[in-house]
């Protein structure tokens, strides 16, 4: 068998998440990919993903691996798979790798981005599946949100920001950066969450806390107390799935990827008039 590494982009709107569900559980990215690989290989193929994105969450660069028969190794995998996959999934890179490569266990970092729609009034219809409409809450206190974001940087026990339903050995995670970027237009703001790894719905829970602070429903001191206490029951609500995108999965030296690239720029400091 030959090990194949895939980089995938997908629109999570109509998926029940990455991971295959029980019978009747809905359409999944993993399921679509395994069906396409089985067609090309003539046998069942198991796919392993770097992250298990939830229903409605998008990906720009999810990474997965699969073992394919040696006699099929020379196929133009990216083109062949994309031709078989539904229109809301694309293979952006495909290459053969060492047989011990593991998309999940070899990952040294991940970057997620969350997009907020900040203009009061209606969200543009074609943006609604990709943003959280916080404009309906009025103007957010961005300076307070940025001050709160600093609390999440470093190594912490994020038990208060993990949703139930996951059995993990430890809830301690190391986060390198939580920062605000310029959005794709004047009505949007993008937040970057960059770290070694994240707990179940942790990024959405962090975003929910930041918006609560921006709305004046909580303070940075409240969030600091919550982080120290580790009690999810006292935490603000979870941000909706559609604003979240898995932007990058990193391998090799930790923390060196996921930095601003082409088309990225930091947001203006809170209160800036430029």
Swiss-Prot record:
Its biological purpose: Formation of pseudouridine at positions 38, 39 and 40 in the anticodon stem and loop of transfer RNAs.
Stated family: Belongs to the tRNA pseudouridine synthase TruA family.
Subunit structure, as described in the record: Homodimer.
Classification via InterPro entries: PsdUridine_synth_cat_dom_sf, PsdUridine_synth_TruA, PsdUridine_synth_TruA_a/b_dom, PsdUridine_synth_TruA_C, TruA/RsuA/RluB/E/F_N
UniProt GO MF annotations: RNA binding; tRNA pseudouridine(38-40) synthase activity
Keywords: Isomerase, tRNA processing
NCBIfam families in UniProt: hisT_truA
Pfam family, one: PseudoU_synth_1
HAMAP family, A to Z: TruA (MF_00171)
Binding, substrate: 112
Source organism superkingdom: Bacteria
Name of protein: tRNA pseudouridine synthase A
Active-site residues, as the UniProt record annotates them: 54 (nucleophile)
GO terms, biological process: tRNA pseudouridine synthesis
EC code(s) of this entry: 5.4.99.12
Catalytic activity: uridine(38/39/40) in tRNA = pseudouridine(38/39/40) in tRNA
